[in-house]
């Protein structure tokens, strides 16, 4: 079995966890890894719009995080079907403490944004973001030291995906977490937009039409002042990705 794993450096903490996982399977699987941080042409050629993309045997594409259980099934020739995560979003906006996300508190997202509560993965993400962002990476919605939601960004000119790139454009890398109970995303995104308007004129994001990942869904963005720029990629049976934007 062959795996081609494309990843955007340490933009997502799961990337580091996945690379560590591969060490355990290097004698069982033909694994090739590609960091697209500086290779925009490669990201475009494989139609990459997630922080990581797995291609199995040069054919089957997976966007979900890889786990040992999945790799073991694949090694046993078991069929693994990736399904979109679709929920009814809670409408009531919930506001805890809205605080800046920085290198000093990025460890807080480890329980929600990693597969193994890996603080080390988050530290690597902080090093990555420090190359491209100011001191503030985004904003968190926090209650009792528990991260409820968050919004993160990077300048569009550093994004390897095939999106509009300009010094005046920001890109929303992560918007989390979607819930059936409350809207935890609204307030951190609102605070991030206020922060970014001092430097940028527009913010772009990628979202699925109906699924929760990435950042989704489209209707949520439309209800919060974003404009649908159209479909940029479609993964049959899994997602239809839209580019959305908002003048700030």
What are these model-derived regions, one by one?
Residues 231-248:
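C-terminal "cap" of GNAT-fold acetyltransferases
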Residues 181-197:
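Conserved acetyl-CoA-binding loop-helix of GNAT-fold acetyltransferases
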Residues 196-212:
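Conserved GNAT acetyl-CoA-binding A-motif
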Residues 209-230:
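Conserved active-site alpha-helix within GNAT-family acetyltransferase domains
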Residues 1-26:
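Local sequence-structure signature of Cys/Sec-based thiol-disulfide redox active-site neighborhoods
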Residues 57-84:
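Non-catalytic, surface beta->alpha helical segment in thiol-disulfide oxidoreductase systems
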């Amino acid at each position: 079995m062959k795996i081609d794993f494309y990843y955007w450096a340490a933009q997502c903490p799961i990337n580091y966890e996945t690379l560590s996982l591969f060490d355990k399977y290097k004698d069982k699987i033909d694994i090739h890894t590609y960091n697209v941080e500086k290779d925009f042409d490669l990201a475009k050629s494989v139609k990459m719009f997630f922080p990581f993309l797995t291609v199995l045997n040069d054919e089957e594409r997976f966007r979900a995080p890889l786990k040992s259980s999945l790799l073991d099934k694949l090694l046993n020739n078991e069929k693994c079907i990736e399904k979109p995560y679709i929920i009814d979003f809670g409408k009531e906006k919930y506001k805890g403490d809205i605080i800046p996300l920085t290198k000093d508190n990025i460890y807080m997202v480890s329980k929600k944004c990693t597969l193994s509560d890996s603080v080390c993965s988050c530290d690597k993400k902080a090093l990555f973001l420090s190359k491209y962002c100011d001191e503030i990476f985004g904003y968190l919605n926090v209650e009792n030291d528990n991260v409820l939601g968050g919004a993160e960004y990077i300048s569009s000119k550093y994004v390897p995906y095939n999106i509009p790139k300009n010094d005046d454009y920001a890109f929303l890398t992560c918007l989390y977490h979607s819930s059936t109970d409350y809207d935890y995303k609204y307030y951190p995104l609102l605070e991030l937009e206020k922060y970014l308007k001092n430097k940028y004129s527009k913010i772009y994001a990628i979202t699925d039409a109906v699924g929760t990942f990435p950042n989704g869904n489209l209707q949520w963005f439309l209800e919060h002042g974003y404009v649908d720029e159209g479909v940029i990629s479609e993964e049959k049976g899994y997602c239809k990705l839209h580019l959305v934007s908002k003048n700030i």
